[in-house]
From Swiss-Prot:
Biased composition (Basic and acidic residues): 1367-1376, 1867-1892
Protein name: Autophagy-related protein 2
Natural source organism: Arabidopsis thaliana (Mouse-ear cress)
InterPro entries from the UniProt entry: ATG2 (IPR026849)
Biological role: Lipid transfer protein involved in autophagosome assembly. Tethers the edge of the isolation membrane (IM) to the endoplasmic reticulum (ER) and mediates direct lipid transfer from ER to IM for IM expansion. Binds to the ER exit site (ERES), which is the membrane source for autophagosome formation, and extracts phospholipids from the membrane source to the IM for membrane expansion. Plays an essential role in plant nutrient recycling. Involved in the negative regulation of plant defense responses to biotrophic pathogens.
Domain of life: Eukaryota
A cellular component term, taken from the record's GO annotations: endoplasmic reticulum membrane
GO annotation, biological process: autophagosome assembly; defense response to bacterium; defense response to fungus; leaf senescence; lipid transport; protein transport
Record membrane topology: Peripheral membrane protein
Family (UniProt): Belongs to the ATG2 family.
Catalysed reaction equations from the record: a 1,2-diacyl-sn-glycero-3-phospho-L-serine(in) = a 1,2-diacyl-sn-glycero-3-phospho-L-serine(out); a 1,2-diacyl-sn-glycero-3-phosphoethanolamine(in) = a 1,2-diacyl-sn-glycero-3-phosphoethanolamine(out)
This protein's record includes keyword Ion transport: no
Amino acid sequence: MVFPWNIAKSAEEAFSRWAVKRVVKFLLKKKLGKLILGDIDLDQLDIQLRDGTIQLSDLAINVDYLNDKFDAPLVIKEGSIGSLLVKMPWKTNGCQVEVDELELVLAPRLESNKSSSNEASTSASTREDLHNIRLEIGKHENEMLMNAAKSASIDVHEGVKTVAKIVKWFLTSFHVKIKNLIIAFDPDFGKKQSEAGPRPTLVLRMTEIECGISEEQVSANEVSPDNFLGINRLANCVKFQGAVVELLNMDDDDDGDKTCDKKTSNDVTLIMTGVGGGFSGSLNFSIPWKNGSLDIRKVDADISIDPVEVRFQPSTIRWFLQLWKTFTSFGSDCFPSVSHSDFLTDSPTIPTNVMVTPPATLSLSGGQELEHDTTPNLQFIPDWFPSSFSKKEEDGEVDIGASVDQFFECFDAMRSYQSASGSQGMWNWTSSVFTAINAASSLASGSLLLPSEQQHVETSCKVSFAGVSVVLFFQDEVNWKGVSTRIHYLGAELRDISVSFQVCLHDLRLEGEVNSMEIADYCQGGNVVDTANAESQTCLIKDLQAKVQTSLPPFASSDMHSDSERLSEIVSDGFLFRNKGFAVKTLLVIAAGGSGFQFTVNFQSSKASHRGSNSFSLSLPPTTFWLNLHSVEMLVNLFNDVSESIPITSHERNQVASSSKSESLRGSVSICNARVILWFPFESISERFCNSLGQQFIVVDLSSSPPSDKERAKERSPGEMHFPSATRSICFSVGDASIYLVTSDLKDSETNSYHRQVEFSAYNILHTNNKTRHQLSTIGMFWQDRPTVSPWLVERAKMLATQEESIQTDKSGGRGLEFAAVATPKDQDDIYSRSRKEIILASSFCLYVHLLPLAIHLDSWQYSKLCNLIEEAKNWLSRMAANTAEQTEESVVCQTSLVVDCDSIDILVRPEPRMGIKKQLQTELPGSWIQFNLRVQKLNLMSVPNLGSVSGADFFWLAHGEGTLLGSVTGLPDQELLLLSCNNSAIKRGNGGGSNALSSRFAGLDFLHLQEPGICNDYLAVSARGCTISAVGGRLDWIEVATSFFSFEDEKKTQEINSSSSSGSSFILNFVDVGLSYEPHHENTDHLRQASDPWVACLVAASSFSLSKKSLVDSIRNDYRIRIQDLGLLLSVDFDLSKLGGTYSSEHLHESGYVKVANDSLIEAILRTNSENGLLWELECSKSHLVIETCSDTTSGLIRLATQLQQLLAPDLEESAVHLQTRWDSIQQANARNDLDISDRLSSSDSSGEMKYLRLESENETGVIGLMDEINEDAFQFDVNPTYQSDSVECQNNYMSPHGISHGQAYNWVPATEKLPSNQSICGSSSRINSESSQVFLERESLPEIFENYCLSEFRPSSEVPQEGDSSGRELFPETDLRRGNSGWYDDASLRIVEDHVSEATEEDHEEHILDGECSSFGQTSYSAVAANGRILLKNIDLKWRIYSGSDWHDSRKKGENFKHTKGRDTTSCLELELSGVQFLYETFPIGEICTSKLSLMVQDFYLYDRSDNAPWTLVLGYYNSKDHPRDSSSYAFKLELKAVRPDPETPLEENRLRVALLPILLHLHQSQLDFLISFFGANSLEKPVVSMGDSGGSTMSVSVQGHNIIEEALLPYFQKFDIWPVNVRVDYSPHHVDIAALTGGKYAELVNLVPWKGIELQLKHVHAAGIYGWGNVCETILGEWLEDVSQNQIHQLLKGIPTVRSLSALYAAALKLVSSPVESYRKDRRLVKGVQRGTVAFLRSISLEAVGLGVHLAAGAHDILLRAEYIFASSPSLPQPQGRTKTNVRHNQPRNAKQGMLKACESIGDGIGKTASALVRTPLKKYQRGDGAGSAFATVVQGVPTAAIAPASACARAVHSALVGIRNSLDPEHKKESMEKYLGPDKQRKQDQHR
């Protein structure tokens, strides 16, 4: 204590009580007069000097003065003090002030905008003037101060020092205690609020609050320059208790008589309270001393608050939102001075120091000279004592009164100075206390200098809460006052909260920690029943949650339950105003353990940088979330309800958005251990009172080890690289993540049986694998302030989705090119990458997710459950979104994006095993698919709503890198089979050659979807690179199993999709380097084959495969365009899955033994669904060129591959096994009864070519009859003509053509075997009939009666079977073209086949139909009573098959040798089969109809070429075109039609009907070519030839099908009937040598090689048969019929092939013509001379041709002999012998006429003379000139004599041959054409004709 007690005694004795009151009143009036309203009455003042107390009572506060001084956004409306007691320090340690019943009423400062703006402008102008004046004064006073400091020293008066010490001690020992503090806040929202009812007022009540200032003393050894008088820090302590925050409903008629504390409880809404009716706390505030003054740059504060309870209800939330809106709307009017003060403070023109000096007459002593540079930041106190002094003062006597007055004058001057320098408002009152302490300290130390106003540097504050409880009611208090009302609320409990923040000049750092947290859902019932069951229901819920937790793996927060039991239960029951019930508690969130919640926040103001930068980090403790979406829904509804009452305008929203965008934000959240449990169904558990507890849960587990600070500093979020321009971002870091599906064992019928003990099972369906433990999965949210509006992004995305750029590249490349531009793939990759970046940068918000390697495990049951739960959650979200959308107004459309990156993903699904799989499909790989495993790398996902800020433009992008799909079957559960691979090794594979220019850089898949607004178009594009699909064991049913697993059936959704077809769509599927591999799996099929049988695998590879579709609006028709570039087929023998190992590169395929056997450069097709012609689907392909290249072994491999696929794709015979055997037995019994084998009867025919019907005689027999009894053998006639014109033509050449019935066309008719009129005999039919006569009209009136029934033959009586002698005349009706489905086998009198397939008469029946098979008619709609539902149409297909000698596979391949070192094929020996203009049609018909399918095949031209280097000629097989066999340009060389019918639709038996027609064939065969064909097809390179089931013939071996023994032949295709129409064949055979050894050994076929065979013309008869099993039997029947007919009827045609016989036959025919022509001419027109002339000319021409032909052959033979002799004798180097051939074939370049022949003859003679001269002169002369000598030259002459002698003879022979060939070509142009086509080929011959 500074003063002793005697001072108080002397003061009491010196002054009287009245004087003391007067003095105290004077002092209080002087210092507190402005704070107190009115004058102080002496009756209100009580002074006890002995006790040291001064007391005032009933004081009113001058609110106007305070409001003017504070200048705050809040104003004090009224205030009062019940009692003010001041205790002097002589009985207490320091000065104490006690205030009782302090009441303040606050209100917002609500000035009008106009007045505020005027005042602001006036204040600004006034302050600017004052500021300028102050600057001028400051300059003048600075000069005076500098002069005074230099001239004299200053000494502070001792009296002032004494007063300063007293004041300093008083201020540092000041204590204030306030009891019963009430602060009310009346927001005064306006008239509308007051008119609506009571006005809520926010009230803060405190029982007691105490504030004191003290000094922290330090020891002597700790005294430093920063300490002052041993004082280290100035401490300020504030303590309060009993604090309560509440809302009072104040009425307008309330006055001062009705104070706040007199309100009833019904008018009070409690907001914040504590355990004992209020909360308490303390605030410790300290400031350090530095250089004798307070260092306010560093302030430390420590706040501690006891447990607090915060309560909210809708009305209070609504009130606070309205309050916030009011403050924000008037914020600009509340801070005009603050903004101006900041302006002045920041102004650079303000001087840093303002110095003032006392008058110059002042006498200072003891002072020291001050230098400017040593005290730059100090200020003098101006005018701190008056200018005149008394003598006593000059003598040093202390005048205390004068010293007091002088001190307070200095204090007022200091306050005035600070007010003038800009310190105004609330801070002026706060900082003046510290400034006064500084002033007192300076004066007490004898210093006249005051420190300048210090800038704040750092403030440290620590706030700790023992606990915080938050209660949120979903209803207002007025709604649950009734006893029976149910109360529903949420309670949150937070324990041990510690928050510390550090405020610097431009930065703010906030750190906090929360030890534990619990959030629960409470529901308290109002009736007695609910109250009685509440406790048991709470236990049931806890038991349920405990069982769910037990079913899950151990979690880090499993020990939190013990902590939660210790949490306070104040939020459950104790706080309620009525304690009549117990609330049912449902735990929602519990977080405890570890280091708790830890968060750090850093704020950097915009003054420190160009843009303020804020950051925060949050670390979560082990947390468990029980997410009940019903509670979330209630929260959302509460928010919507509250927001309705306080709508936010768009202007306010824009202001908030603009203010929030001024600073950047970076946040990071680290989730170490968290468990989220989603509760299903979405109902409030507490409201339902556990009648039906949750049965299904989705649990998400997140766990990771928190990274260290160094690792966190080094880490950079991957999202920041994708979104560098983001101004605000929040990143969540997660380590390992797992998702579980938890289900109960309750059945649906036991749902409400909650009393039963329920057990739960957890299934891990998703988890991440953090192998390194250093990497974390991240979830980032990024915001951008001003994203660029880019509507052009929609067009860019449309280009990507439609792949327009790649299509344009293909078009620019031109048709027929195998490869496109090389730069296209790289450019496309660049476009994808650039577009992805542009889309991300144009987003205002981006959610980025980066996942570690992810694994998903699901079975079908789990997936269905998960889909149901997700669907329920989606419905909930859509409902909530709809409710929220109704409350919100439209805002600006902004683009947002979701980006997901995953390092790898592993999806394992287990579908249910399927039953009823085809047994044939399981031939190689038995079992059902039970598991699929999909593994992909680098998964990227992007979802962008409102792309380019265009409303409704949604874009989705999914991409991944390499990947594989593995599968397992029940037969091999432990073995995974590769089903699909997407590998970089397959890049550039193309068609297997490894040179695909369309390849991309990396393998992968891209899935793009764009929904374009406005026109409502959907664009979908799927692109895959390096993809190979595997059909292990020939099974591709895994595609259906996999897709059906993920197809979640929803009938309503399907109906909605089907009904919403009003929008157009576009779909593109594009594959690059795609392949389809068939890999036989023969591990378990050894019993089906012998060990020596090899297996063949194949791979169909393509450089590019694209499928595109565009759907029109309101159209069900879809057209899919298919485009395949560079297609190849590769084969491999003895295939083993271990060879490939999942690698399908071209190099590895070649090493594994794959050989390319077929390729096609371009294939274009169209697949139509729901087409206009009534077809469900239709596939059309045109203009394709297929090239097949094989050797003998690969050809056998193709055959074996077809056999393997046939066994896999064969129909299931289990259902039809009994019917197959019954059909076989019926036919065999019928054959036995008739004692006639079917094959013998089919081969019978008469000499005229008529065919007899195959009928089974059964007149007197009963029983089972053959199925073919009722088949009319002429039912398959191609064309008929009702009228026949006679002409004298040979019978063997009579047939009818489809177009004009001309010779040479395919036969479209069947010769009638019934009795025909004489004018319709076959032999007398015309060979040339006009096309008009061939047109047949089918009139409606002429239709016979149609029987629409069909009876199986075994159930029909024998009387109905037609008899053999039934010869009733019948009309011939034409059948439609190959695509028509109309067909009928009926007669006017009797119906032979009575089937339901006869069509009704249609409009087309009135039109004429010509059965010509033209291309124009091929492919038209089928007009049948039952239309086809599917169709495959191939048009203008070109096929080339090249067969080479050699082998593609080495013979020692089984020894493990590398296929890379095989010998390979010999390309010098090659035959090529060319089919051009191929038309193919296949139609399917609906199930239940008689006709099941129809196949039609037509070939425009077919040729067989010899492409060998030593080929004797080019054309081997072709069309026989001659004057006797003319051909129409539109006719086809080959026609085939195959129909599959089902006589009984209810019986699964199909029977085939076949008909084939051929144009005349020309065969030029050389012996070498025949040997090549025999060696190629006769010797199978594979170990054992495939024995076709059709080759078994009459085998009686049986197989077992479903326990039934069935003959193997009965399983073969059954041909109800087939027709092979007559065909003419012209054969030329040139032998090369005769195998004498084989001939002598009995091989008499060598006799054919003795002589050449020329011009053999054979007419192969029409073959008609019925009831044949197998293709092998069909071929045997056809060949047998033909051989028998040729051997019996056309042996003379073979003899004509001998050249001598042919010449004699020609001379005989010419001589006969010479005699018969005059006779015929005379008989016809009585002109004999003309006939003689014709006969003579014909005779002479025939003799000339034979003579010339003989000469040609002789000359050619002589030339060949002489040429060989010339090569033998030639020794000159100038005449080398050819390596492959011994002669030049002159026939390849034969003269076209006699003139050209003579020219070539002259050239030949000249060449011969030149050779002679060269041998005798030129060659010896060259040797002589080189210096060989005369002897050597003479020897050369002797050696050249034979050559010189033979060369002219050889040249003459060649000249004669050329001349004769020219003459023959002039006389016989037809032979010339045939010869040129033979040696040059048809194509080259046509080109030469065009050039000439």
